[in-house]
Amino acid sequence: MEYPLLDNTDLPLVLLGGTLCNARLWQPVIERLNVAAVSCITLTGAESAPQASRRLLEVLPPRFLLAGFSLGAIVALQMAADAPERVNGLTLISVNPLPVAPDTLASRREAVRTAQARGLADWLVSSLWQSYVAPSRLSDRILQETICRMAQECGIETFAGQTEMAIHRQDNRTAFNALSCPTLLLNGAQDVICTPHHHQLLAAGNANVTRHTVEAGGHFIPLETPDEIAPLLRQWITECIQC
């Protein structure tokens, strides 16, 4: 379905990608959304989620709509906690709001060293691909190539920095519960990284949340199921504009 152009120039849409993701993550969704003002941000140049939040808030417009995927959702949640008056709508996709378990820190940093030694694409396919997408998409070579290409374009330094952002994050559930803007939670039913339970933890505390589970989706639902994601995002954007 082709939508008419949606004028959101007063509330531009800001899209934050996840670990080893760039604008390619959002392209299928953007093509279907047809909105006037949208920007895609690759998370770099910060050593923690709070630092990433501060740096983005320094350069973004006074008011905007914010959507984040995975690590991008963690940073988006931090931004909404830091400046709720500026975030006029929030969408979190494939998010785990909980702090990182201390016993996983060493393995996360070791993953960066292994990826550097083996090459990002080879490491990703052997270590992460099985958990990235729904079982029905594991043989989808185009999808795999897209995700690997993003990783290679981001590079190992970006991966190392994003790993530190993910490690150094806060539990912002209390701040999330206090948000009054239109809020959307999207998750894949078959996501083993950011599970449906993680999204239930967030949805339970905020009466303004709309939650949708993509039954056929894994972790990478913006790429796996853009036809299902885009209408939900467009409806959310429309609601934000009308508020």
Which residue stretches match the model-derived regions?
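Catalytic histidine-centered segment of alpha/beta-hydrolase-like enzymes
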Residues: G217-A230
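Short alpha-helix in the alpha/beta-hydrolase fold that links the catalytic acid
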Residues: C181, T195-A204
